[in-house]
Swiss-Prot record:
It comes from Sus scrofa (Pig). InterPro entries: Opalin. This is Opalin. The lineage of its organism: Eukaryota, Metazoa, Chordata, Craniata, Vertebrata. Central nervous system-specific myelin protein that increase myelin genes expression during oligodendrocyte differentiation. Promotes oligodendrocyte terminal differentiation. Residues 1-33 are extracellular. Keywords: Cell membrane, Cytoplasm, Glycoprotein, Membrane, Transmembrane, Transmembrane helix. The keyword Transmembrane helix applies.
Length: 142
């Protein structure tokens, strides 16, 4: 299979570079091969990038499935790693109604006891300001 390019110019125009050597201007196959190399490289890079993204997504989805799986009570007592991490245990889930279940007191440096602030639950004042509750005056029945 041979490949050749045939360039013809209209009669009233002149071509700028005049070929003076004895060899002809038949460089068609090498020109076609050189023009195809960048597109082949770009295609290979896109395929490699796609494979990397698919591999990362599979690996991250497998790790999140393991983390989000509910923890059985028997697993808490049998596995020391789970027992050391109380965030995974079902006893430390958020209370849906927002009421506090227990008060934890922390002894400060000065010796007085203060209730420990729960870092996972926003303060009551912040919950009131989320809506329009801050517009309603606080009425105390005491």
């Amino acid at each position: 299979m041979s490949f050749s390019l045939n360039f013809t110019l209209p009669a009233n125009t002149t071509s700028s570079p005049v070929v003076t050597s004895g060899k002809g201007a038949d460089c068609g196959p090498s020109l076609g091969l050189a023009a195809g190399i960048p597109s082949l490289v770009a295609t290979a890079l896109l395929v490699a990038l796609l494979l990397i993204l698919i591999h990362r997504r599979r690996r991250s989805s497998e790790s999140t499935e393991e983390i989000e799986r509910p923890c059985e009570i028997s697993e808490i007592y049998d596995n020391p790693r789970v027992a050391e991490n109380p965030r995974r245990s079902p006893t430390h889930e958020k209370n849906i109604m927002g009421a506090e279940e227990a008060h934890i007191y922390v002894k400060t440096v000065s010796g007085s006891q203060e209730p420990m602030r729960d870092t996972y639950r926003p303060a009551v004042e912040m919950e009131r300001r989320r809506g329009l509750w801050w517009l309603i005056p606080r009425l105390s029945l005491e």
